[in-house]
């Protein structure tokens, strides 16, 4: 962010506003003084603080209402925004947020080779690479891979990015400690699914993990979207007979896609974290 003076401090910051969900702000004073007002949602002042460069200025919490005003003519200050690692790439590069199942499973993944099968623009690949994993990203969409490559270069992340058709069931690169495929297999030709899953399994190192999230269609909850492939109840679990299931459920979830009323589409998903 730029350095502002008493004259150039943006008008929106002088008025009531708040930080976004998942975003923290920190104010740094280089010279002079600034008045910070804590507000309620109606604009009433809850507290007033005078900050200088000697002040220990706290972070502004997400969605906290506030406003500021110069308290001296020689004011020089700037703002820095912060977020959690799982939100970083989404906020900075306008990507979809890292999948919640990837975030949850990451602490138990062995630090090694990760294959993101159907990576798209890299919402999961970038997060895992930033966490120190050796990531390979495969996807059929060249435009998505190009954006991923640009972000990886800008962030100084070494990600192996390759075009790949999942239906070929011919994963490159030997064995992986982790293979993830989140919200991808529903777009695959259903006749290739047995080969695709067998290929994932055969390229998973002993003790390694497969994390899959995919659409379902069941008698009690037919899939509202015409995906090429939807899993029946228990189908994915059967493919992984003999593996250790650390997580398996067939719960309802939401797509980012919306219906004609603007509501996110609800449907049943199979979520599985299996260890070889």
Model regions: which residues?
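A short SAM/SAH-binding and catalytic strip from SAM-dependent methyltransferases
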Residues: 178-192
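A short acidic, Gly/Pro-enriched loop at the edge of an enzyme's catalytic core
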Residues: 171-179
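Conserved short histidine dyad/triad with adjacent acidic residue
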Residues: 2-22
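Short, conserved beta-strand element in jelly-roll/cupin
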Residues: 25-35
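A short glycine-rich, Lys/Arg-flanked "PGG" loop and its adjoining helix->strand segment in the class I
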Residues: 194-206
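Class I (Rossmann-like) S-adenosyl-L-methionine-dependent methyltransferase catalytic domain
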Residues: 14, 83-109, 115, 121-171, ...
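Short acidic-glycine-tyrosine-enriched beta hairpin
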Residues: 42-62
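Ligand-binding loop in jelly-roll beta-barrel domains
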Residues: 61-83
């Amino acid at each position: 962010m730029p350095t502002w003076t008493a004259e150039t401090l943006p008008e929106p910051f002088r008025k009531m506003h708040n930080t976004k969900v998942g975003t923290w702000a920190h104010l740094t004073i280089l010279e002079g003084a600034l008045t910070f007002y804590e507000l309620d949602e109606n604009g009433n002042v809850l507290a007033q603080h005078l900050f200088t460069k000697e002040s220990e200025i706290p972070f502004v919490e997400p969605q906290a209402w506030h406003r500021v005003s110069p308290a001296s003519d020689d004011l020089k200050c700037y703002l820095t925004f912060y977020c959690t690692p799982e939100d970083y790439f989404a906020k900075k590069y306008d990507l979809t947020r890292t999948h919640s199942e990837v975030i949850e499973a990451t602490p138990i993944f062995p630090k090694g080779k990760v294959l993101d099968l159907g990576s798209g623009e890299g919402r999961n690949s970038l997060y895992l690479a930033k966490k120190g994993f050796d990531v390979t990203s495969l996807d059929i969409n060249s435009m998505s891979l190009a954006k991923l490559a640009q972000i990886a270069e800008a962030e100084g992340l070494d990600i192996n990015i390759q075009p790949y058709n999942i239906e070929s069931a011919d994963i490159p690169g030997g064995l992986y400690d982790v293979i993830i495929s989140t919200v991808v297999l529903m777009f695959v030709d259903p006749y290739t699914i047995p080969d695709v899953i067998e290929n994932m399994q055969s390229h998973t190192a002993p003790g390694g993990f497969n994390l899959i999230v995919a659409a379902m269609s069941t008698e009690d909850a037919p899939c509202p979207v015409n995906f090429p492939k939807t899993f029946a109840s228990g189908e994915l679990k059967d493919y992984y007979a003999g593996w250790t299931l650390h997580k398996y459920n067939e719960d309802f979830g939401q797509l980012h896609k919306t219906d004609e009323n603007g509501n996110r589409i609800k449907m049943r998903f199979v979520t599985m974290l299996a260890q070889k």
